[in-house]
Design a protein with these regions (language model features):
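A short, conserved alpha-helix within the catalytic core of class I
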Residues: 110-121
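A conserved beta-strand element that flanks and buttresses the S-adenosyl-L-methionine
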Residues: 102
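Hydrophobic adenine-recognition pocket in adenosine-nucleotide-binding enzymes
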Residues: 106
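Conserved alpha-helix/loop element of class I SAM-dependent methyltransferases that forms part
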Residues: 21-37
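C-terminal alpha-helical "lid/dimerization" subdomain adjacent to the S-adenosyl-L-methionine
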Residues: 130-174
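C-terminal lobe and adjacent flexible extensions of AdoMet/dcAdoMet transferase-like proteins
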Residues: 175-180
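Class I SAM-dependent methyltransferase Rossmann-like catalytic core
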Residues: 6-24
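Class I SAM-dependent methyltransferase SAM/SAH-binding core
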Residues: 44, 48-91
Length: 180
């Protein structure tokens, strides 16, 4: 995915929709995959807060804490009332336990070892994990930036997190793992 829009919260949604034509389907499928009404939610890569907004529409009693590594996105999300911390997915996760850890279009930035490590830490601190992301596919529909976008096969990620693929379209997938 092109880096030019990653830092600008004002243009991010339009740009991501231009690059990923099924972006809204991915978001909807991710929210649909939530296995229960969560209370404590950790979102990895909160960005503009779009996933949090959609989650709260469906689960208004949820309390969401977000993480993002981009200061511009953290500032934007905070301006819109989202509790978000400046942190990378490689950093220790905020203390759980969490009912749900959720992520949309963030995990593909980690290499395979980074993904396995993240999934191990998520499993230790949560009841469930739902992820919607770009996955390795042939053909690769989503434009990728070399060295930045590192998609893995959906089947591998499902195995690594102890989950299952619950939705797939082109080179996008939603994976859900329930741990309790």
């Amino acid at each position: 995915m092109s880096a030019q829009f990653h830092m600008d919260p004002e243009t991010y949604l339009d740009a991501i929709r231009a690059e990923i034509s099924r972006y809204d389907e991915l978001q909807d499928a991710t929210i649909d995959a939530i296995p229960f009404a969560p209370r404590g939610v950790l979102e990895l890569g909160v960005g503009t807060g779009e996933t949090t907004r959609r989650l709260l529409e469906r689960h208004p009693d949820a309390e969401v804490t977000g993480l993002d590594s981009q200061p511009e996105m953290v500032f934007h999300a905070r301006e819109h009332g989202i509790a978000v911390r400046l942190a990378r997915m490689q950093d220790p996760l905020p203390d759980g336990p969490w009912d749900l850890v959720i992520s949309v279009l963030s995990v593909h930035h980690l290499d395979a070892d980074g993904k396995r490590d993240l999934f191990r830490r998520v499993r230790e601190q949560s009841r469930a994990f739902v992820m919607g992301d770009v996955v390795a596919a042939d053909p690769q529909v989503t434009p990728l930036e070399e060295g930045v976008d590192l998609p893995s096969a959906a089947e591998d990620m499902a195995e690594w997190c102890g989950g299952e693929i619950v939705w797939r379209a082109d080179d996008l997938a939603v994976i859900r793992a329930v741990y309790d």
